[in-house]
Amino acid sequence: MAKKKAFIPFFYFTSIVFLPWLISLCCNKSLKTWITNWWNTRQCETFLNDIQEKSVLEKFIQLEELFQLDEMIKEYPETDLQQFRLGIHKETIQFIKIHNEYRIHTILHFSTNLISFVILSGYSFWGKEKLFILNSWVQEFLYNLSDTIKAFSILLLTDLCIGFHSPHGWELMIGYIYKDFGFAHYEQILSGLVSTFPVILDTIFKYWIFRYLNRVSPSLVVIYHAIND
């Protein structure tokens, strides 16, 4: 009976790890057809931010330049001009299809992330007792570690998150989140987040060392500074 009770929190933790993937898989299969039909039948008004609007305008300017080129080469045989116009027409249709697929992808991922957040929030609230048990296990495990291992682990974690080579990792992670939520890639916003977020984390971490670790385990702070130096 005791083993069964001990297994329940572990099973709950495993379900939390894999639940977002299952939700994403189910939502992508069930919502994609519905969102595609809704987008195509409602003929929704296109909602673009400034960055996406600029990209769309650039594409249409390129097409307009092709049409102007078409007018400049009237001396070409009529058959060649017809093929040229047909090629431009196909490119325009292809661009519209790509744009529609991008908007459907954006709505689908935003809806999936919203549903995942709601389900995980309810699931976590429902299993808060199991989370308390898992938290006690983690605290007991960390308490049994030596101060040297704790200091080394903290140093490794901080170097990964806010170290010299961390901006590239943050750039990849923030870029993935942007793409997952369907946001357009904007280099200035991405660079601003990459340059400021690690600094904020570094400040919070130093405050945590000053306020918490100095009070709980002064020896751990001494070992950490010795390894860091």
Curated annotation (Swiss-Prot):
Designated name of the protein: Potassium/proton antiporter CemA
UniProt-listed Pfam families: CemA
Keywords: Antiport, Chloroplast, Hydrogen ion transport, Ion transport, Membrane, Plastid, Plastid inner membrane, Potassium, Potassium transport, Transmembrane, Transmembrane helix, Transport
One Gene Ontology CC term in the entry: chloroplast inner membrane
Keyword Membrane attributed: yes
Reactions mediated catalytically: K(+)(in) + H(+)(out) = K(+)(out) + H(+)(in)
Source species of the chain: Olimarabidopsis pumila (Dwarf rocket)
GO biological process, one term: potassium ion transport
